[in-house]
Amino acid sequence: MTDIHNHKILILDFGSQYTQLIARRVREVGVFCEIFPHDVAADFIKNYQAKGIILSGGPESVYDSDVKAPEIVFELGVPVLGICYGMQTMVMQHGGEVKGADQSEFGKAIINILNLTNNIFSNMEHEQLVWMSHSDKVTQTGEHFEIIASSTNAPVAAVAHKNKPFFGVQFHPETTHTENGKQIIENFVVNICGCDTLWNIENIIENDIKEIKQKVGTDKVILGLSGGVDSSVVAAILHQAIGDQLTCIFVDTGLLRLNEGDQVMQVFAEHMDINVIRINAKNRFLDALRGICDPEQKRKIIGKLFVDIFDEEAAKIENAKWLAQGTIYSDVIESASNNQSKAHVIKSHHNVGGLPKEMKLKLLEPLRELFKDEVRKLGLGLGLPYNMLYRHPFPGPGLGVRILGEIKKEYVETLQKADAIFTEELYKHNLYHDVSQAFGVFLPIKSVGVVGDQRRYEYVIALRAVVSIDFMTATWANLPYDFLSLVSNRIVNEVKQVSRVVYDVTGKPPGTIEWE
């Protein structure tokens, strides 16, 4: 079996918002990499046995901060690539000088490559469009580094050590705005570090299955299946590895999208022949939420009841030794960053449930090395449907946070129908994958309408569709008026409890994507 971790890159994080992008670009080239805080122990860096090290950007100023790259980085003899802050600290630690720029530079810029024979710029033209994001600049490279690229506002846009495989770029090759950024990453990782491209879906599947078999043996495994991307892919890889040793528990809260519970059962229980226990808990959730209007209270009630029901059912499964979870690599990074990183974490992720306290289960996380895009590709490789893997994000509390105020059975059914029409038309008009997220929101207010000669006094549905790269910011989707008119007409005509449809044109910020 191929050792997919044999050649790897170590990324030291100085707090850049783009650090995870660096890792994703390295992996897209076909090489495994991991992110660790910049102040990780020197012994750890030495024992990690990386083929190369990347120093990320960061929000600090090098000359005002004691945050530097560990000296061990430059003593190991492996290639080093410094990006933005990473370049600045590397140059300064080798006798160069960094000062505040007269003018900050954020956005696209043209750099001129002065030395095309340098390996970091192999297979590239002299002029390159790149993405800058910095307030400081290198003013003196010192005796060890030479300038290999420059721009109008950044005379030192890239550097190379005269004798060692150390390189620095002031711009961000990891962003898509840098036209040939992936080529720069590939040049460093493959050509300079000499990494073999072993990190691919076929090898990952083979490696994961072998690891799961070795770890689990003949033990039984429990998985909380939600129908979301992560738990679905965990179910598929575990089923392929250990077959009927896996039992999935699917808690149907009644707050899912229209027919979603049946679809989950169809894919996993019928088509894939996975042992899935479906718990119809709709009434328990409605009872628990009766009279509750506060969004945060609703979230807590839904989360706690989900865990309670899962625990009840899991306790009935005899001889189970493992609890599988859909933890992915970005969760691992965010969890670590809460304690160690300089990055400002906007939202942390918590898998629903965690380990039930009274159950002596070991944790199994087959996806913890993978980013979301890799999880989706893994799912395709395991035979899961494309539409399941590339669906829009759905909140953990489900429709509970898309029904404003109190949740009632009538409200849930009304929203499910309206939301399904919106989604169906997005697919029909090939717009679904043009937006990042789209859904309906139930407003518990009534509005007068007229259908035929009949006066109607029914509820209002708000449609929400946004375009976003990272969901930290978003713009409202400029969907065609004819399309919105069609969706509105269908909802008002087919969902009897709705008399009016509105479209949300609020960005994030100032609004959030979800209404609650």
From Swiss-Prot:
PROSITE patterns: GATASE_TYPE_1, GMPS_ATP_PPASE. It comes from the Bacteria. It is an enzyme of class 6 (ligase). Gene3D superfamilies: 3.30.300.10, 3.40.50.880, HUPs (3.40.50.620). Homodimer. Residues 199-391 form the GMPS ATP-PPase domain. GO terms for molecular function: ATP binding; GMP synthase activity. It catalyses: XMP + L-glutamine + ATP + H2O = GMP + L-glutamate + AMP + diphosphate + 2 H(+). Pathway: Purine metabolism; GMP biosynthesis; GMP from XMP (L-Gln route): step 1/1. NCBIfam families: guaA_Cterm (TIGR00884), guaA_Nterm (TIGR00888), PRK00074.1 (NF000848). The lineage of its organism: Bacteria, Pseudomonadati, Pseudomonadota, Gammaproteobacteria, Thiotrichales. It comes from Francisella tularensis subsp. holarctica (strain LVS). ATP binds at S226, G227, G228, V229, D230, S231, S232. This is GMP synthase [glutamine-hydrolyzing]. It holds the Pfam family GMP_synt_C. Catalyzes the synthesis of GMP from XMP. Its EC number is 6.3.5.2. One of its GO terms (cellular component) is cytosol. Residues 8-198 form the Glutamine amidotransferase type-1 domain. The keyword Nucleotide-binding applies. The active site is at C84, H172, E174. Keywords: ATP-binding, Glutamine amidotransferase, GMP biosynthesis, Ligase, Nucleotide-binding, Purine biosynthesis.
